[in-house]
Amino acid sequence: MIIVDTGFWLALANEQDNHHQQAQLVIQRLREPLITTWCVFTETCYLLLTCLGNHAQLLFIQNFLAGGFEVFELQSNHVRRMDQLMDRYEDIPMDLADASLVVLAENLGHGRILTSDRRDFSIYRWQDNHTFQNLFLEYP
């Protein structure tokens, strides 16, 4: 499963986004299931609504309902870990959605991610010392 961040979803939906063509190429070529978190899902819906309108938000939700990707269920122990991560990276600062993706990586046992956030995900570490592999911006 490949982890997906908000920036990838936005690039995929927005034809004016600098990374739109790259996002389309990646989504056409990848053959692995995609997974995100409810924090990212919510952030994506909000940004799609405010930047592109209700139709874009509804298409995203319908993609989920059609099985286009999975959403990881966070438990209270995951939220505790997110709190620790947000404290650790307070100088960046780390937001809730990013913290949830680090927790997701820790649960999956890998950091293969689709994100346009090169800076932050080059700093974040899952299980405190493993780096993320950005499959979006590094895709051939």
Task: Explain the meaning of each model-derived region.
Residues 109-140:
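Acidic, PIN/NYN-like endoribonuclease modules and their adjacent C-terminal/linker elements
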Residues 71-116:
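Active-site neighborhoods of divalent-metal-dependent phosphate/nucleic-acid chemistry enzymes
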Residues 7-8, 39, 77, 119:
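Alpha-helix/helix-capping structural signal
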Residues 1-36, 49-61, 139-140:
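Short, well-structured N-terminal submotif of metal-dependent ribonuclease cores
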Residues 51-55, 90, 129-133:
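Short, hinge-like loop/turn segments at secondary-structure boundaries
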Residues 29-33, 67, 92:
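Structured helix-beta-strand junction loops
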